[in-house]
Amino acid sequence: MKYIGAHVSAAGGLANAPARAAEIGATAFALFTKNQRQWRAAPLTPQVIDDFKIACEKYHFSAAQILPHDSYLINLGHPVSEALEKSRVAFLDEMQRCEQLGLTLLNFHPGSHLMQIAQEDCLARIAESINIALAQTEGVTAVIENTAGQGSNLGFEFEQLAAIIDGVEDKSRVGVCIDTCHAFAAGYDLRTPEACEKTFAGFGKIVGFQYLRGMHLNDAKSAFGSRVDRHHSLGEGNIGHDAFRWIMQDARFDGIPLILETINPDIWAEEIAWLKAQQIAEAVA
């Protein structure tokens, strides 16, 4: 069973997100649980929590179908102690908000060394940041997103994701989210079924499919191996339709949120319908 959706707006209240997802025919969704451009947010009230849970139940979304995303401000590998601590406090708050909402996943970008510390030191800081948050929460898995490798962002190589996981003490509460645009921009080819097989065979060997807890399905405006993060609508970019058809027809991607972050929300319903159709076509065949 594929859970397919998009990163929807929670404007007007978190309880609006499940309704917006249902409107576009989604069976999964992503959201921010707070304003992602601000460090601090007002605590969740019992009313907000209850309304969100009721809406999820109304529209038939379980925690396994929801992939919250943390603030882009957070850098869990920051080279400066004070800034690192600020990010760790904010990340813990994000994890606790998920815990309160009954959500079991939190997707985040791993971090950046800002050209100030060695890559290995940054990866170790990220792992320790995860350990700190896991020790103070229950039931929420920290889901590391691969990056395009733009600037000094780490997480663009499968080996870097594996290194972070290796440093996490509770392996049952760490996972990864593979963004197809980021992977392509980082040099992992997805343009043909054969390329997809090779790329994900490497992922399985280096990271392991047991850690795959979600995906972002995005085509790429950016060129292969460019280390530039530019999303595009499915089939409109440099990856093309084949990769997304291949993912829909591979059971290894069942049971996890498959989230669109493509550039035109007006066609998300069409993109979701197309993805569902690829799955049905495979089942019939």
Curated annotation (Swiss-Prot):
Keywords annotated in UniProt: DNA damage, DNA repair, Endonuclease, Hydrolase, Metal-binding, Nuclease, Zinc
Name of this protein: Probable endonuclease 4
Origin species: Salmonella schwarzengrund (strain CVM19633)
SUPFAM superfamilies given in the database record: Xylose isomerase-like (SSF51658)
Binding site for Zn(2+) 2: 145, 179, 216, 261
Transmembrane stretches, start-end: none
Listed GO biological process terms: base-excision repair
Functional description taken from the UniProt entry: Endonuclease IV plays a role in DNA repair. It cleaves phosphodiester bonds at apurinic or apyrimidinic (AP) sites, generating a 3'-hydroxyl group and a 5'-terminal sugar phosphate.
InterPro entries according to UniProt: AP_endonuc_2, AP_endonuc_F2_Zn_BS, Xyl_isomerase-like_sf, Xyl_isomerase-like_TIM-brl
Binding site for Zn(2+) 1: 69, 109, 145
Family assignment from sequence similarity: Belongs to the AP endonuclease 2 family.
PROSITE patterns in the cross-refs: AP_NUCLEASE_F2_1, AP_NUCLEASE_F2_2, AP_NUCLEASE_F2_3, AP_NUCLEASE_F2_4
Cofactor: Zn(2+)
Catalytic activity: Endonucleolytic cleavage to 5'-phosphooligonucleotide end-products
Gene3D superfamilies for this protein: Divalent-metal-dependent TIM barrel enzymes
Cofactor note: Binds 3 Zn(2+) ions.
Lineage: Bacteria, Pseudomonadati, Pseudomonadota, Gammaproteobacteria, Enterobacterales
One Pfam family named in its UniProt record: AP_endonuc_2
HAMAP family cross-referenced by the UniProt entry: Nfo
EC nos: 3.1.21.2
Single annotated GO MF: deoxyribonuclease IV (phage-T4-induced) activity
Residues the entry annotates as binding Zn(2+) 3: 182, 229, 231
